[in-house]
Amino acid sequence: MPAFKSDFLRTMSERGFIHQISDETGLDQLFAKETVTAYVGYDATATSLHIGNLISATMLYWLQETGHRPIALMGGGTSMIGDPSFRDDQRSLLTPEAIATNIEGIKRIFGRILRFGDGPNDAIMVNNADWLMKLNYVEFLRDVGRHFSVNRMLTFDSVKLRLDREQSLSFLEFNYMILQGYDFVELARRQNCRLQMGGSDQWGNIINGVDLGHRMGTPQLYALTTPLLTTSSGAKMGKSAKGAVWLNGDLFSPYDFWQYWRNTEDADVERFLKIFTRLPLPEIARLAALGGSEINEAKKILATETTAIVHGREAANQAEETARKTFEEGALADTLPTVGADKAALEAGIGILSLLVTAGLASSNGEARRHIQGGAVRINDQSVSDDRRMVTLQDLSPENVVKLSLGKKKHVLVRPA
């Protein structure tokens, strides 16, 4: 990686964000001489972003922090189709109402990460439905479609994957990359946007936009992608025992979010501190140098700093305090995740297997049984060895809850409802 002159690209390089850049020298010179507008696109396929999206959102933060202007593009139009990149099947089509609801949910996270306003480098949020839904089909084919080579589009990895597996790729999905390329041109015209950023799986789509801009007479456009983020053991990030790691607290609690980062593998701590926190690099180097059990302190800092960015400092501190009380003092913290159980069902008795699934500590009865056989399950801090164990009202603590635990770090309170 070259020694960048601009603050933004130097920050991106030092913190490990860069996978590919379409023209390193040209983009570096552009950042060094003027305020640059750049964007990341987010399709509204759910009511929240997940931690995979946090990488690109953090890039937008550093873009603004180094004096440039970020755009968060909501895919209100492209979400009507769905991105086929590296998928085995076609996405379910969403209604306009569902997309609008999803966009409202996604907006919440950006309010914590970016500064919005009317200043020269204040962030803006735009929706590609504003131009895509107004297109005339025949004019679009004539003015835009003629610049795309089907032969070249068929060589993109995201398309080849589907075709090589002899899986259907609809004409609807095939058009997605054309629309994404056109988004770049529209933002160049409307907002003088010169750079699109995204994950490495979006490289082909972004380059389409760079090439389309050249053919349609925009100023030089640029592409920058991040590496696919995996753990040191090779696992793709973003999944937990409870499913996807969402950024909105109503889908994945701040406590669970904190715990996700606290459970980071030792080998990943330095890399994740660089990418997901705003700590100075010398402080990160100090934390990364900790050995033995001291590395756990670095993991706690990673968890607290990342949770503070996504959920706010108060929620992060509360999550850290809950963990401390639960693990270090053995106390029953009232901020642990909670699920309700029907009181009548508890009176009759609820099987431990189904209760573990309900609590999100297992994905199936089979997985719950394996946890019990492995000695990982406890009720009120007492080990469970019988997978036919029934949980009843007799198990309620003085606080009127049943504490379910999986291993040392995962706890859920069951309350009669």
From Swiss-Prot:
L-tyrosine binds at residues 39, 176, 180. Pfam families: SYY_C-terminal, tRNA-synt_1b. Transmembrane segments: none annotated. ATP binds at residue 239. A motif ('KMSKS' region) lies at residues 236-240. The lineage of its organism: Bacteria, Pseudomonadati, Pseudomonadota, Alphaproteobacteria, Hyphomicrobiales. Belongs to the class-I aminoacyl-tRNA synthetase family. TyrS type 1 subfamily. The keyword Aminoacyl-tRNA synthetase applies. InterPro entries: aa-tRNA-synth_Ic (IPR002305), Rossmann-like_a/b/a_fold (IPR014729), S4_RNA-bd_sf (IPR036986), SYY-like_C (IPR054608), Tyr-tRNA-ligase (IPR002307), Tyr-tRNA-ligase_bac-type (IPR024088), Tyr-tRNA-ligase_bac_1 (IPR024107). Its EC number is 6.1.1.1. It is an enzyme of class 6 (ligase). It comes from the Bacteria. It comes from Mesorhizobium japonicum (strain LMG 29417 / CECT 9101 / MAFF 303099) (Mesorhizobium loti (strain MAFF 303099)). It is found in: Cytoplasm. Catalyzes the attachment of tyrosine to tRNA(Tyr) in a two-step reaction: tyrosine is first activated by ATP to form Tyr-AMP and then transferred to the acceptor end of tRNA(Tyr). Keywords: Aminoacyl-tRNA synthetase, ATP-binding, Cytoplasm, Ligase, Nucleotide-binding, Protein biosynthesis, RNA-binding. This is Tyrosine--tRNA ligase.
